[in-house]
UniProtKB/Swiss-Prot annotation:
Keywords: Cytoplasm, Methyltransferase, rRNA processing, S-adenosyl-L-methionine, Transferase. Its main location: cytoplasm. GO terms for biological process: rRNA base methylation. It comes from Clostridium botulinum (strain 657 / Type Ba4). Specifically methylates the N4 position of cytidine in position 1402 (C1402) of 16S rRNA. It holds the Pfam family Methyltransf_5. Gene3D superfamilies: Putative methyltransferase TM0872, insert domain (1.10.150.170), Vaccinia Virus protein VP39 (3.40.50.150). This is Ribosomal RNA small subunit methyltransferase H. SUPFAM superfamilies: Putative methyltransferase TM0872, insert domain, S-adenosyl-L-methionine-dependent methyltransferases. Its EC number is 2.1.1.199.
Length: 309
């Protein structure tokens, strides 16, 4: 299958980077190369782009899409490791970094990846297929209490306790091997009247995907390391697709903008923690009505941007 992915908030994200033609930029989630291509259009031959992705299919697709550009470095890795990646490339500071945290259309549409609750496929959900932990491992090996906490915390699923119990009961008969089997278990666990609010498996699949790929743990560290690697006035632009991610970005940006831990009664700061960034987006930028109509997957997207000071 061809790697297809419509870049969300494309114009807004590129504008937010305030691109310098000779600058160095990092696309932490290369995907099909949509954002990267627009960055490269604004760079001179002296500028440089580092494209990172943990999915080899994404890197292959991006190389084809960006084949006319010679100032691209492709890195098969997780952006959690951005600090060591730049270290290995002997790059100290960069002028801008973007993260698009959404699952690509390709990953959702290719049934064999196991991300979609709309298509029956083996339980997988690994962004990086070289990793050992898959959705199969989570569903069939995690204890009931662990499953409950994952569904509750990562999926904000109100029926997390019941779904976890139903999963454990079903797997005692036979291992749960496909997304279709999991969807049926979820349907049986959620009362019919609550299944009118979108697909009943949506929150559970989100939660399992986040657990498999350690998405939230990765994000906190990646934001800190990215800010440390920015030049003065460099920008960090992050697109999120659900409230858990957005909350992490919002809170981390606030911590980095106002890190002082002194009591409010202190007349001056004595903790020595200096502000590292200025938040550009007091409220997140959301897709236009037109974009939401054209690309339904953009509806929940939010863009937050900060500037290194």
């Amino acid at each position: 299958m061809e790697f297809k992915h419509i870049s969300v908030l494309l114009e807004e994200t590129i504008d937010s980077l305030n691109i310098k033609e000779d600058g160095v930029y990092v696309d932490c989630t290369l995907g099909g190369g949509g954002h990267s291509k627009e960055i490269l259009k604004k760079l001179s031959h002296k500028g440089k782009l580092i494209g990172i992705d943990q999915d080899t299919s994404a890197i292959k697709a991006a190389k084809e899409r960006l084949k006319d550009y010679e100032n691209v470095i492709y890195v098969h890795n997780n952006f959690y490791n951005i600090d060591s990646i730049l270290e290995e490339l002997d790059i100290d500071k960069v002028d801008g970094i973007i993260m698009d945290l959404g699952v690509s259309s390709y990953q959702l549409d290719e049934a064999s990846r196991g991300f979609s609750y709309m298509k029956d496929a083996p339980l997988d959900m690994r962004m990086n297929r070289e990793e050992n932990l898959s959705a199969y491992g989570v569903i069939n090996n995690y204890k009931e209490e662990e499953l409950f906490k994952i569904l509750k915390n990562y999926g904000e699923e109100k029926f997390s306790r019941k779904i976890a119990r139903f999963i454990v009961e079903k797997r005692t008969e036979n291992p749960i091997e496909t997304t279709g089997e999991l969807v049926e278990i979820i349907r049986k666990a959620i009362p019919a009247k609550f299944q009118r609010e979108g697909h009943p498996a949506k929150r559970t699949f989100q939660a399992i995907r986040i657990e498999v790929n350690k998405e939230l743990q990765i994000l906190n560290k990646a934001i800190e390391d990215s800010v440390n690697r920015l030049n003065k006035d460099g920008r960090l632009s992050i697109i999120t697709f659900h409230s858990l991610e957005d909350r992490i970005v919002k809170v981390k940006f606030k911590e980095l903008e106002k890190p002082c831990t002194c009591p409010p009664s202190f007349p001056i700061c004595v903790c020595g923690k200096e502000p590292q960034i200025k938040i550009i987006t007091k409220k997140p930028i959301e897709p236009s009505k037109e974009e939401k109509e054209i690309n339904s997957r953009s509806r929940s997207a939010k863009l937050r941007v900060c500037r290194k000071i």
